[in-house]
Amino acid sequence: MKKKKKSEGYMTLSPPLSMQGKMKSLFLVVLLIIAALAGVFTYQGLQYDFETLDGETYLWQDLNGQWVVVNYFAPWCAPCLREMPELAAFNQSLPDNTRLFAINYDPKTKPELKAMTEKFAIAVPVIVSSPDTKLPMTKPPYLPATFIVGPDGKIKDTIMGEVTAVHLRQRLTELKGAD
């Protein structure tokens, strides 16, 4: 095909897309749609702040209006293990409008975490620590550490060191009275 100058009134035409080119374009469009849908479904599937070992998922906003106690522990922390029966006792008779969760200081897989909770007879809901876990507090500098989150979602108290069921109940009563 001979090109003519624009001044002669002719334009250069590009050859039509071949069938192979059309198929490639169609394939890319379909691939982009699938990728976009997969991203949307993945995003919607991970719309929670934390998950417990028993598979329950939670958003902090859904816990608004409740008092939430979060206890950081580790199997290598003797005081943490000593306070676990106290936390279990507290969990058995939670004050009104109160939730209790424990979270292992070191990230573990679900099977590792399950084995650990069975080995140490941990009888409170345990949060699975993962990169996706969102808590209103940062990891504490030492253990055990217990955080009390108020109904507004803000940390109301941090207790560093061992706690007892009586101490937790007393502290919650004080905080609820001040609120």
Question: What spans do the regions from the language model cover?
Answer:
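Conserved hydrophobic/aromatic "anchor" residues
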Residues: 48, 72-73, 116, 124, ...
